[in-house]
């Protein structure tokens, strides 16, 4: 799987790649990467639970970027903990809700690249390993939500002593109520009352689980949509009493 002809080593960090194209990303624009550009990192978010769909999240020590790939079951070859080099030359970088993404062109915006294109641009390094430092979440407090720079999203985070606003023993994470809504938003509340949106796909394998009540420890990917922070859970198991 992948392309073993891709050269060793990165040419740029993920944070610097996002900075280089910051104006394109923040304008929800699109630009092809036309020079030698390689990033190296570890997958910190895959599609196993169904909450992340046709995307992978890859991290190095500097940050995380979203990769759009028009395939499902990506976790079979690219699970959390898989290290890789990505040859970005020829791919497109752009913004969706001002969140940086690598992919190809879809209706004039950045979209998911075909699976065969992904395989040409990725080289897997070793076996998956859950001990990479990139897989350790940063502690997120209520104060961080106003001080952290949204341009750094996604960020792998952990929160302590938060609770779901609507948890009543019956409310589900993402009940499919018909219609066109493919995701449901719930609020996580910090002890000081600060709220954070948790957005869950109705296709997630935990969508029909009851929202846990009481004080929780929660890990997830802190992302953005425009000027709003939102949390994506990688699995239902990352919400602990």
Residue ranges of predicted features:
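OB-fold nucleic-acid-binding modules
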Residues: 1-53, 57-83, 87-241
């Amino acid at each position: 799987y992948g392309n073993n002809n891709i050269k060793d080593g990165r040419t740029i960090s993920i944070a610097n790649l996002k900075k280089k194209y910051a104006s394109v990303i923040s304008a929800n624009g699109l630009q092809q990467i036309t020079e030698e550009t390689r990033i190296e990192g570890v997958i910190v978010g895959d599609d196993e639970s169904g909450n992340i769909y046709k995307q992978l999240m890859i991290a190095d020590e500097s940050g995380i970027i979203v990769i759009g790939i028009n395939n499902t079951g990506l976790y079979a070859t690219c699970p959390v903990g898989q290290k890789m080099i990505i040859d970005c030359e020829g791919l497109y970088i752009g913004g969706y809700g001002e969140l940086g993404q690598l992919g190809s062109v879809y209706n004039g915006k950045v979209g998911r690249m075909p699976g065969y294109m992904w395989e040409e641009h990725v080289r897997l390094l070793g076996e998956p390993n859950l001990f990479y430092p990139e897989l350790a979440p940063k502690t997120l407090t209520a104060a961080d939500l106003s001080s952290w720079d949204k341009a750094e999203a996604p960020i792998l985070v952990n929160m302590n002593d938060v609770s779901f606003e609507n948890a009543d023993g019956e409310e589900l994470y993402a009940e499919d109520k018909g219609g066109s809504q493919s995701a449901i938003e719930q609020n996580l509340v910090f002890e000081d009352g600060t709220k954070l949106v948790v957005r869950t796909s109705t296709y997630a394998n935990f969508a029909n689980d009851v929202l846990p009540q009481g004080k929780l420890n929660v890990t997830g990917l802190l992302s953005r949509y425009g000027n709003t922070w939102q949390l994506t859970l990688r699995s239902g198991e990352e919400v602990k009493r």
